[in-house]
A protein has these predicted regions:
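Positively charged n-region of N-terminal signal peptides that target proteins for export
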Residues: 1-7
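Bacterial N-terminal signal peptides
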Residues: 9-19
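Boundary at the C-terminal end of the N-terminal hydrophobic targeting segment
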Residues: 20-22, 27
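Short acidic-hydrophobic surface loop/beta-edge motif
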Residues: 33-38, 314-318
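M16 family metallopeptidases and their MPP-like homologs
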Residues: 46, 51-67, 73-77, 89-190, ...
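Active-site His/Glu-centered metal-binding helix of metallohydrolases
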Residues: 74-82, 345
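An aromatic/glycine/proline-enriched structural segment found at the starts
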Residues: 191, 195-199, 212-216, 233-234, ...
Length: 383
């Protein structure tokens, strides 16, 4: 959570109209209101009344590093499912839909148990189980109101609705008119309190296609995946955020809901809001809506430490594509005193056309079309 607060504070600083060096830091701090609710949710508000709008950013302190074994891609899948609605949003009759979704899970479990058999799998039985599963999906689909969550946001002036998943965290964001703040609190608290895994297997197919496009069919994507798999042994950064194809094909809506209940907790989340907002008026609204989410202890941090690397590791792909080169060095986590040093080194070496890498490789030697570097790839939470 300390890392999340640092990132969110940086976001708030960037929201100011003048460069940070021109600001009175003490004055800035007076404009920031921060409170932790009784259930553990941390809320940060920066009042910026120049326009009657606000933006928010919700950070969940979990990412693909928390993906369970044999269920890689689950954190990213949960990000997709967060837009599918709740028990109130996205359904014509949730009581009936809930029964139908339970049938989907029941038939999928039977189908998957037969599919993964190593010995004695019955093709005819598998085909019948698959049909029963698909029929159950079709029955549940009758209750779905497609994209209702997004339509509510957009029809009330919301823009920029987006989300992302990294190894370390998951983020959600969009902007709305300031007079829609209570609507925002209602729907955002609802999606983190009452998620429904509707259209799960259809969305899983979307993610599988995303993997095929960005990794399996992309020379660069395949190289980066193998690069990380070679660079790390024990650290969960060696697994792809989008997940392995075989895992995507296997995990269930029940798995996703279990992941949600384990990691999407108030104590594991921070919400930052910037805009034409009065903290004294807004905080009671947030407490009324988000405070209803039950409190649970913050999840236990991963403790696995990457063993020292004592020799060079290389991976090479022979592909009919433009040459692409990646080189990496292990670094400590963000808790290390030298964390800022790595950012400074990266800035000097690879930030823009005046950086040393760009000048040497692109401008002077003309051996590269582009050159870039990152101090926090693939993550900085674990080492």
């Amino acid at each position: 959570m300390k890392r999340c607060f640092a990132k969110l504070s940086a976001l708030l600083l960037l929201a100011l109209t003048l460069p940070l060096t021109a600001q009175d830091l003490a004055s800035f701090e007076k404009r920031v209101t921060m409170k932790t609710l009784p259930n553990g949710l941390t809320v940060i508000i920066l009042r910026r009344p120049e326009a009657p709008v606000f933006s928010f950013f919700t950070m969940v302190d979990t990412g693909s590093a928390q993906d369970p074994l044999s269920k890689t891609g689950l954190a990213h899948m949960m990000e997709h499912m967060a837009f599918k609605g709740t028990s109130d949003i996205g359904t014509t009759d949730y009581a009936e839909e809930k029964v139908a979704l339970a049938k989907v899970e029941e038939t999928y479990a039977a189908y998957e148990a037969e599919r993964i058999k190593r010995v004695g799998r019955d093709p005819q039985k598998l085909a019948q189980l698959q049909k029963e599963w698909q029929d159950a999906i079709a029955a549940a689909d009758k209750f779905v109101v497609k994209n209702q969550f997004g339509e509510i946001v957009e029809s009330h002036g919301g823009v920029g609705m987006n989300a992302f998943t990294t190894y370390d965290e998951t983020g959600y964001m969009y902007s709305m008119p300031s007079n829609m703040i209570e609507l925002w609190a209602a729907i955002e608290s609802d999606r983190f309190a009452n998620p429904v895994m509707r259209d799960f297997y259809k969305e899983r197919n979307v993610v599988m296609e995303e993997r095929r496009m960005r990794t399996d069919s992309s020379p660069t994507g395949r190289l980066v995946e193998q690069f990380l798999g070679t660079a790390f042994d024990a650290n969960p950064y060696h697994r792809p955020t989008i997940g392995y194809a075989s895992d995507l094909q296997a995990f269930s809506a029940t798995d996703a809901l279990n992941f949600f209940h384990q990691y999407y907790l108030p104590s594991n989340m921070v919400i930052a809001l910037v805009g034409d907002l009065d903290p004294d008026q807004l905080m009671p609204i947030i407490e009324r809506y988000f405070g209803q989410i039950p409190a649970k202890p913050k999840p236990t941090e991963l403790t696995t430490v990457e063993p020292p690397q004592n020799s060079v590791r290389e991976v090479k792909l022979n592909d009919p594509a433009q040459p692409f080169y990646v080189e990496g060095y292990h670094r400590p986590s963000y808790l290390d005193p030298d964390d800022a040093v790595y950012d400074a080194i990266t800035d000097i070496l690879s930030n823009g056309r005046t950086s040393r890498m760009y000048r040497a490789l692109v401008r002077d030697q003309k051996i590269a079309a582009a050159a870039a570097g990152f101090s926090g790839f693939p993550g900085t939470k674990y080492q």
